[in-house]
Each structure stands twice: as C-alpha cells, then as structure tokens.
C-alpha cells in the first residue's frame, strides 16, 4: 500500500539497501501488532487483505524482469494469497540456474516441486508426511519427500532440538544434525525468516549448506 506501515517498511528496507517493488496504493499494507507483557508476547493482531489474480500478474511480470543478476531466490510463503503460482517462480528461476529457497506454508508441498531447498519447521513437515513416529521414520520420510518434490535438500527446523539437514550427494541423501545452544528466548518471531535468509546468503557466497 501507500500507508504509514508501507512508508515505515520502505524506510527500514532502504536503510539496508534493499529495494521494494510493486506498490499498490489501493491495498492496506499487511502488518502485525504484538501485545506484550514484559518480554512475553500475549496476543498478535494482524491487518491484511487478500490478493487478486490481476495483482498476481503484475507480480509475475516484475519477478521475471528483475531476476537477471541474482544469485538466489527466497520464497517465504505466509499463506496470505500473494503467491498464487509458486511453480512459475521456480520455473523462471531454474531457467537462469538460480536456486530457489522456500520457507513453506500449509499442508500441500507439491507446489514447491523443483525448488533447491525447503525449510519447514518440524510440525509443518510432520503434517505434510502424515506424522513422525521415530528418528528413523523421520529420516525415511524426509528422503521420500526430497525424491517426490525433486529437491536438492531439505532443512527441518526443530526448535530446541536444533535443525536437521537432508542433502543429495552423489546419488545418496545424507543427514546432518545441528544442535542448538541453550539461551533464554522471549520472542521467536521471525526465526524461520532468519534461518532461510542466512542460509541463502551464505550458500550464495560459496559456503556449503552444512556450513551455511
């Protein structure tokens, strides 16, 4: 939109040299109001509007035009209706050999087929594969999902248990576990976004997924 929230967002992005595209003056900018008691979040109030197919066409055209020169594409799906055609984004990126990093949403991951990597949390992953009964079951179902969706890798975030990476390597799918360090955390907002942004940035800079 062109409201106060949009102005603040553009200023914050501009301070980090990030360009913002596709402003729609008729829309209310999606924003979230968090009510806190001390450092604990009690409630969150969201303000948002759904998107139309016409608006998605503008997004598709802008996406295709701006792809040149990029090292990675991050698709962070919040389930707000903005990402009408994720397969299109993946297809356009793959034409230019640009890896697509996806933070998924919902209980149907088929639309993410062909992405380089997806980064669901454990609940999202478990829901998608019909539940997890053990660590070996976790590994088997992760490998099946990678094959089904033609992914190069799968990173599952597991809260206090850290993260688990499954990655294709010379015809095999290897598992790597990354434990967490104990810390007092009062607000986990944006944790998934931080993971995928850090992962894509590091990997695009030449680091391996394991080191990223």
Residues covered by each model-derived region:
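Conserved phosphate-binding/catalytic region of the ribokinase-like
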Residues: 66-69, 84-114, 129-131, 135-211
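A generic structural signal for short hydrophobic patches within well-formed alpha-helices
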Residues: 125-126
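Substrate-binding N-lobe of the ribokinase-like
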Residues: 1-31
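Conserved phosphate-binding/catalytic loop of the ribokinase/pfkB sugar-kinase fold
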Residues: 21-27, 32-67
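Short, hinge-like loop/turn segments at secondary-structure boundaries
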Residues: 11-14, 38-41, 117-121, 171-176
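Short acidic, glycine-rich surface-loop motifs adjacent to enzyme active sites
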Residues: 69-82
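Short internal beta-strands
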Residues: 1, 100-104, 120
């Amino acid at each position: 939109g062109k409201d106060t929230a949009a102005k603040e967002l553009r200023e914050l992005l501009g301070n980090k040299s990030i360009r913002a595209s596709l402003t729609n003056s008729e829309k209310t900018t999606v924003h979230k109001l968090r009510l806190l008691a001390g450092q604990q979040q009690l409630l969150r109030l969201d303000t948002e509007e759904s998107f139309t197919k016409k608006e998605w066409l503008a997004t598709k055209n802008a996406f295709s035009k701006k792809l040149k020169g990029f090292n990675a594409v991050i698709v962070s799906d919040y389930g707000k209706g903005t990402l009408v055609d994720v397969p299109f984004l993946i297809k356009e990126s793959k034409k230019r050999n640009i890896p697509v990093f996806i933070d998924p949403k919902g209980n149907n991951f088929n639309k993410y087929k062909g992405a380089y990597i997806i980064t669901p949390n454990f609940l999202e992953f478990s829901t998608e594969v019909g539940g997890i009964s053990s660590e070996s079951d976790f590994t088997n179902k992760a490998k099946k999902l990678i094959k089904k969706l033609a992914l190069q890798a799968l990173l599952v975030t597991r809260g206090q248990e850290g993260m688990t990476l499954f990655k294709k390597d010379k015809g095999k799918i290897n598992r790597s576990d990354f434990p967490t360090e104990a810390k007092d955390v009062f607000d986990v907002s944006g944790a998934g976004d931080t993971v995928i942004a850090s992962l894509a940035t590091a990997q695009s800079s030449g680091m391996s997924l394991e080191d990223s």
